[in-house]
């Protein structure tokens, strides 16, 4: 019965990994990166008469900034992400224990075990551990993506989100971005760099044959997973 339970557990784990591989990302599958469209005003609201000469609903400003500031406006983000991380760890432990017991005297004479053997003896214990670890990681992401303003917060900051898909031969490459933007950080040409976005979520990946070639199969992921004994 135990062997049957183990076999069923392994099969269920394999199926989970397999299902994950069968559902790669697709355009529009995540609402967190879906575009936001401008809200069309209700004609009934525009026809309301308040008695004043000026109406904010039908006002046409003479001068207006081209920067994104309303839900549905488009903002271009230049990706300049670069991270360099390096970590070194060295551990050395050493312990030496030495114990010496001298022969005792009895009636002024050393105690003997016979045949000339003395009770003098030494105990020497040495333990040593050396450990060393090193990790180096470099990441760089450059490019651009246009996103839309999803929401304007009470303090004027804007929540932006969007994705870009590019099909190259037999595969797709995508960039997804979401975060919070300050209006002061938007340049005059309606662009902003990714390092000025708060709470940024940037994803870059791909689907297709090339991406599948660079990924491990479901059985390899099980064998190299943390649950498999080394």
Curated annotation (Swiss-Prot):
Keyword Membrane: yes
Membrane topology: Lipid-anchor
Signal sequence coordinates: 1-18
Keywords, ordered alphabetically: Bacterial flagellum, Cell outer membrane, Lipoprotein, Membrane, Palmitate, Signal
InterPro entries the record matches: Flag_Lring (IPR000527)
Lipid addition sites, N-palmitoyl cysteine: 19
Gene Ontology BP terms: bacterial-type flagellum-dependent cell motility
Pfam families in UniProt: FlgH
Residues carrying lipid (S-diacylglycerol cysteine): 19
Principal subcellular localisation of the protein: membrane
Location of the protein in the cell: Cell outer membrane; Bacterial flagellum basal body
Cellular component terms per the entry's GO annotation: bacterial-type flagellum basal body, distal rod, L ring; cell outer membrane
Gene Ontology MF annotations: cytoskeletal motor activity
PANTHER family noted in UniProt: FLAGELLAR L-RING PROTEIN
Function description: Assembles around the rod to form the L-ring and probably protects the motor/basal body from shearing forces during rotation.
Description of how the protein assembles with itself and partners: The basal body constitutes a major portion of the flagellar organelle and consists of four rings (L,P,S, and M) mounted on a central rod.
NCBIfam families: PRK12701.1 (NF009341)
Family: Belongs to the FlgH family.
Name of this protein: Flagellar L-ring protein
Originating organism: Legionella pneumophila (strain Lens)
Gene this protein is translated from: flgH
